Amino acid sequence: MKRSVLVIALSSLLLSPLAMAKDLQVVASFSVVGDMVKQIGGDHVQVTDLVPPNGDPHEFEPTPKDSKTLAQADLVVVNGLGLEGWLNRLVKASGYKGSVLTASNGIKSLKMEEDGKTVTDPHAWNSMKNGIVYARNIVDALAKADPDHAADYRKQGDSYIQQLQQLDDYAVKAFAAIPKEKRKVLTSHDAFGYFAAAYGVHFLSPIGYSTEAEASSQTVAKLIKQIKQEHVKTYFIENQTDPRLVKQIADASGAQSGGELYPEALTDSNGPAATYTAAFKHNVDAIAGSMQ
């Protein structure tokens, strides 16, 4: 009799809503938005990044495994602004019918002329004020997808947004202390437009918004001349791009290495930029430090 009561009690526990609850399965297009979801979602979410750490979201090629991962998601979070050109065909191939959050919704985008076309700069997260917009969008999407834990998402989101605001203030103060004529650096590609607009830094690069673009010999020669004329003394490589071209330009112009930046891909957990906030602070410290 006692054994029967015990079996019934265990069965009731296993069938209870608490025991049956599962984490929200979220697929993120790349590591930056994936980390934001992890920070806000906490223990209630399982996040899979399609583009792995140190991976280039511009050149990513989805696999059948990615299609299967997407098909099992409860929510998909992407950057938008044209970053994930491969997304639509992946969604179609996977048969995913759920919600897709574009984390950049509400951002005032930047544009430039590239190869005779007007293109949108997708790297909005490199301004921390934009990062706050991303975070708010993610909070709302998680709360809608998993209303049972909405209060937790909003509490964790508020705390996270405070961190982002503090980092924005940190960056503003760091660059305000540097004379404007010194705020110039060379990078691999034009991923810092929003950062430049927010913090008053001038970035030079051989290629535009996408790492898939190629620089012509005329562009390279013109850039080398500009670097010399403007006395740009430091160049940076990026963890997700081929460094050879920017090193070639630096050698020809006399610019010295300032190290590595993380504008659109986080590192693995052992690296210096394993989270969005760590990557941003690293970039601020490295860039500002090179101008001293």
Predicted regions and their residues:
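Cleavable N-terminal signal peptides
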Residues: 8-9, 19
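Absolute protein N-terminus
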Residues: 1, 21-22
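Extracytoplasmic metal-acquisition and chelation regions
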Residues: 22-292
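Bacterial N-terminal signal peptides that target proteins for export
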Residues: 1-7
